[in-house]
A protein has these predicted regions:
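Glycine-rich flavin
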Residues: 43-51, 56-152, 163-167
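DPxDG-like acidic metal-binding loop motif
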Residues: 142-181, 185-187
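Alpha-helical interface subdomain recognition
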Residues: 1-59, 65-75
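Internal glycine-rich alpha/beta core junctions
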Residues: 194-197
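Short secondary-structure boundary micro-motifs
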Residues: 11-12, 23, 31, 94, ...
């Protein structure tokens, strides 16, 4: 079997029990208002999502991922979303392959070199100017939304390469380690408050 399904029936049952246990914990903590009050999913929950394989689910096997089917992934996200909508949102947006698939193979190898359990957050719009320098692109700007950014390992931001005031080429995405990004907590909404978007 492939993806989030286990090789043996006993493993499959254990995996299912682990997922159900996590979903119960998520439900209980969501009911206390924890995620909404802090406006993001708690980092220990992100770590538990990593442990059960959410973020490696769609990562190619050559990078240590599970390569599960879209159906399997959607079923997993449905279960998490039934426990708490914000957790489901962050789990689905945090999977990196959909956003990073257009990157060069060497960049992907670098991103996944330590683990396939990489949590992504994207602050794509509005694209900000990125200064073209001899070393590459210097990225600086402010992006409005980035679901799951508080628990992300890497953050993708929309940029437009520029020299002076002139734009060079099409908009693209720069991928930055999360520890090199300043996050301003401006997320104050009624719905999906716990996503930290």
């Amino acid at each position: 079997m492939n993806g989030l399904s286990a090789i043996s029936l006993s493993n499959q049952v254990n995996d299912e029990v682990e997922l159900e246990t996590l979903c119960q914990e998520i439900r209980e903590r969501a009911l206390t208002g924890e995620f909404d009050d802090q406006a993001y999913v708690s980092l220990d929950i992100i770590e538990k999502l990593k442990k059960i394989g959410v973020y490696r689910a769609l990562v190619p096997a050559r990078f240590g991922g599970e390569e599960c089917s879209p159906r399997e992934f959607c079923e997993l996200i449905e279960k998490l979303s039934m426990a708490d909508g914000s957790v489901g949102w962050v789990a689905s947006f945090g999977m990196s392959p959909a956003y990073l698939a257009g990157l060069p193979e060497s960049t992907l190898a670098q991103i996944y070199q330590d683990s396939p359990d990489v949590v992504f957050a994207g602050g794509i719009f509005p694209p900000q100017p990125a200064e073209i320098t001899p070393e590459g692109l210097r990225v600086k700007g402010r992006w409005k939304f980035s679901s799951g950014c508080m628990g992300a390992d890497i953050i993708g931001v929309g940029i437009t390469p520029s020299q002076g005031k002139e734009t060079k080429g099409l908009p693209r995405m720069a991928v930055i380690p999360a520890d090199q990004v300043q996050i301003d907590m401006t997320w104050d909404t009624v719905g999906l408050k716990g996503t930290g978007s």
